[in-house]
């Protein structure tokens, strides 16, 4: 064992954020004291840090570390900015004024709000320098951080299966086809644990999935493996399965049977017959209902998750002092909001209000959770009753919108907590299989596991990694994952309306080697260039990377962008209520601008066919390439 234990990562190579869950709260408390001269206490619970502050926080040092709003005559104290930074929140400087006629108006100081955003970003960077200096001057603290980090994140060695344990041909497979080494190794891994086959296009995921299902069946770890594939590739996939395993008993759904009656007969065949492999189109798979018991468990988990996020929210009086004492739970899922009653009448009123808010939230969350599960399904046996004990899903990126609760506000770009109902259904089915198979027999496959948002890698870990393991790593909640491995920065970005705007964005990762190590515990990553001869068939990209071409803005595009800009400026001037009623405007304008940038005719069919459009430039470049490479 000593030979394979990873080398300890020295403290000077370890990065951590303001808010990393594995850091002792005393370090954050010392930082607040040093910068603001305010004594606070931090408590970690349910994926965030709660700050308990003293009654009196108004001192010169705290004020100078904060931000002042001349427009509203308000001051955001330094410790409040640090709290926002540690919770990855933004601060909006505003006030609500009531008029004599009973109406009210919310006034926002945009300059002070932007100043708070910039200051919070500065605090995140300043903390890293401050902590680094502390570690240099305090060797004992440095050693402790090094030990905690290595014990927590540097404790896994990626599996390496020796070639002598990999058969040339798996039992029952034709000897006319030999899997590549990376395929055979992935099959062996897939029979041992839940796994993401993060194999690039062209590396042979189809044969890997087929072989894994058949090996599960041969070894007796699964009696009824199901493979989910895209509708258009069902026939091709089944043909590949018969080619690799000529004697396999395979059930699939023909195109002519993809109707309600055909699906009903198909489900009966699944339940009452013995199959080596069941190949299901995605659309049919999504029609299979889940058991009521599993749905109820899902709903209860969602309620608990939502209440956990509610428990994170700061409840402050007019002076900005916290009135609620929060307690961390022993297990994150069992977090219960403990609202301590304070001795004053005001606190009693607030406590009653909070309990009412909690009850309403619980009710709303249950309704929301039920909506997440409400999708069109067939009236047939549920997935549990079909006795499927192995589930292999091709093109798994179709199910990456699992959704999650977060205390981060919408001010952080690159974070998408939205969900899709089909993803919820897949999650329930994977949980059913994991339960039946004692924590294995779930295989995902995709060439693009991470394509758009920071949440995707975390989402796939939720599918495949035991919740207890995620808790041990301190990444069970998305907010903890971001604080431990994310890098949030303020960046100047080009907006849909053609202006530059500073946004807080999930800009990348820190401690990437350790994150990759955790990810590799549930994934098998293969790039085309590493796939043994596959890359030889793919022509090299000109210049080694995509080329940027700059074109002048067309007259039609200029007119469309002027319209988009005017609409968005009008939207920015709306009140909060009006923005809520017209929430479709930003997305609509973004879609229009994106389409017009390709070709104005996608927005206005009467627009001219401009020779300077991206469409025409793409045609010219394609013709040039064809002529240059013509033999």
Q: Where in the sequence are the language-model features?
A:
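Conserved SF1/SF2 helicase motif Ia
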Residues: 208-239, 248, 436-440
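Conserved helix-turn-beta segment of the N-terminal RecA-like "Helicase ATP-binding" lobe
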Residues: 232-258, 269, 464-468
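P-loop (Walker A) phosphate-binding loop of NTP-binding proteins
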Residues: 200-201, 230, 448
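Walker A/P-loop NTP-binding motif
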Residues: 188-193, 203-221, 429-434, 464
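Charged, low-complexity intrinsically disordered regions
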Residues: 1-153, 246, 270-278, 294-344, ...
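Inter-lobe coupling linker of SF2 helicases/translocases
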Residues: 263-353, 360, 364-367, 371-390, ...
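Short hydrophobic/aromatic beta-strand immediately N-terminal to the Walker A/P-loop
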Residues: 195-200, 226, 443-444
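Conserved pre-motif I regulatory segment
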Residues: 157-198
């Amino acid at each position: 064992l000593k030979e394979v234990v990873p080398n300890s990562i020295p403290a000077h190579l370890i990065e951590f954020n303001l808010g990393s869950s594995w850091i002792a709260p005393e370090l954050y408390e010392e930082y607040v004291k040093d910068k603001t001269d305010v004594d606070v206490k931090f408590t970690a619970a349910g994926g965030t840090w709660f700050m308990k502050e003293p009654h009196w926080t108004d001192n010169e040092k705290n004020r100078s570390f904060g931000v002042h709003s001349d427009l509203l005559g308000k001051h955001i104290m330094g410790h409040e900015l640090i709290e926002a930074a540690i919770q990855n929140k933004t601060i909006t400087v505003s006030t609500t004024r009531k008029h004599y006629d009973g109406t009210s108006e919310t006034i926002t100081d945009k300059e002070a709000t932007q100043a708070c955003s910039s200051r919070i970003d500065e605090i995140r960077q300043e903390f890293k320098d401050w902590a680094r200096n502390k570690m240099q001057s305090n060797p004992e603290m440095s050693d402790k951080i090094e030990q905690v980090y290595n014990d927590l994140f540097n404790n896994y060695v990626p599996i390496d299966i020796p070639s002598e344990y990999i058969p040339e041909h798996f039992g029952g497979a034709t000897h006319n086809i030999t899997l590549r080494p990376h395929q055979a190794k992935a099959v062996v891994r897939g029979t041992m644990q839940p796994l993401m086959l993060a194999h690039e296009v062209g590396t042979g995921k189809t044969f890997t999935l087929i072989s894994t299902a058949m090996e599960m069946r041969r070894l007796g770890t699964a009696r009824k493996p199901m493979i989910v594939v895209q509708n258009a590739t069902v026939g091709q996939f089944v043909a590949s399965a018969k080619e690799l395993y000529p004697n396999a008993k395979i059930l699939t759904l023909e195109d002519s049977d993809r109707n309600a009656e055909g699906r009903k007969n198909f489900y009966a065949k699944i339940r009452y017959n013995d199959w080596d492999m069941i190949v299901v189109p995605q659309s049919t798979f999504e029609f299979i209902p889940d058991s009521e018991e599993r749905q109820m468990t899902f709903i209860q988990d969602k309620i608990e998750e939502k209440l956990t996020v509610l428990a994170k929210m700061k409840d402050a009086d007019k002076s900005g002092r916290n009135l609620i004492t929060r307690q961390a739970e022993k297990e994150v899922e069992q977090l219960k909001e403990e609202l301590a009653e304070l001795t004053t009448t005001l606190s009693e009123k607030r406590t009653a209000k909070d309990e009412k808010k909690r009850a309403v939230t619980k009710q709303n969350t249950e309704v929301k959770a039920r909506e997440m599960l409400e999708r069109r399904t067939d009236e047939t046996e549920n997935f549990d009753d079909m006795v499927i004990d192995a589930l292999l899903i091709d093109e798994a990126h179709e199910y990456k919108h699992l959704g999650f609760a977060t205390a981060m506000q919408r001010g952080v770009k690159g974070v998408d907590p939205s969900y899709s109902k089909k993803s919820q259904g897949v999650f329930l089915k994977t949980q059913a299989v994991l339960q039946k198979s004692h924590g294995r027999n779930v295989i995902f496959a995709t060439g693009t596991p991470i394509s758009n948002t920071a949440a995707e890698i975390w989402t796939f870990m939720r599918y495949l990694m035991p919740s207890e393991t995620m808790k041990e790593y301190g990444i069970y909640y998305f907010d903890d994952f971001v604080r431990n491995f994310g890098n949030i920065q303020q960046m100047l970005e080009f907006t849909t309306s053609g202006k530059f705007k500073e946004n807080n964005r999930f800009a990348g990762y820190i401690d990437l080697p350790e994150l990759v190590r955790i990810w590799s515990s549930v994934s098998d990553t293969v790039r085309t260039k590493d796939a043994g001869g596959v890359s030889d068939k793919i022509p090299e990209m000109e210049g080694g990377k995509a080329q940027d071409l700059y074109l002048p803005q067309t007259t039609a595009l200029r007119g469309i962008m002027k319209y988009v800009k005017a609409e968005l400026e009008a939207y920015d001037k709306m009140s909060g209520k009006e923005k809520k009623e017209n929430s479709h405007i930003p997305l609509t304008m973004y879609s229009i601008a994106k389409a017009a940038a390709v070709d104005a005719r996608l927005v206005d069919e009467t627009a001219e066919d401009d020779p300077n459009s991206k469409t025409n430039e793409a045609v010219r470049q394609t013709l040039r390439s064809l002529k240059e490479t013509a033999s």
